Amino acid sequence: EIIEEECKINKIKFSKKEFEEYLKKHQELSKTASAGRFKSGLADNSEATTKLHTATHLLNEALRIILSKDIKQKGSNITPERLRFDFSFDRKLTSEEIKKIVDLVNKKIQESLDVVREEMSLKKAFESGAQGEFGAKYPEKVSVYTIKNFSKEICTGPHVKNTKELGKFKIIKEESSSNGVRRIKAILEN
């Protein structure tokens, strides 16, 4: 009704039937595009995907510690089989760097660190040192997941309660995603 009124005021041709058909097509397209995809880049909400999601947070911080504090997440995709993590970095990782990253992630898994969720304002989250995905749009109130004394990120979850639930972390591939962006694919083994 509001749209019809605005169209009349602005002398714009409006067909309610065409509008409803367009809206229905758009909704179907949106459903298709987002099928099996949550906002957090997760393919589903399974235990395996949840574990890999938590491992992604460990990986992100390990990259920042081993390579550079300037590293920013550029995207992720997590399925029950593997995680894919894109990050800002301008060169191929050496085998020594990959080993250090894997070792650090596995060390944090073995330390049995608690994963704690807090809700806070976006401003407070950034002031507290929480990392966020570059270019992401966040609501005013956000969830922040902290992996005890290691990682702190704005995230919608879900996560395990403790890193000991994860198993052994292993990078299976490191490659270029695009100019200035690297991609890591990794798995968790029992």
Protein language model annotation of sequence segments:
Residues E1-N190:
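A glycine- and charged-residue-rich anion-binding loop/surface
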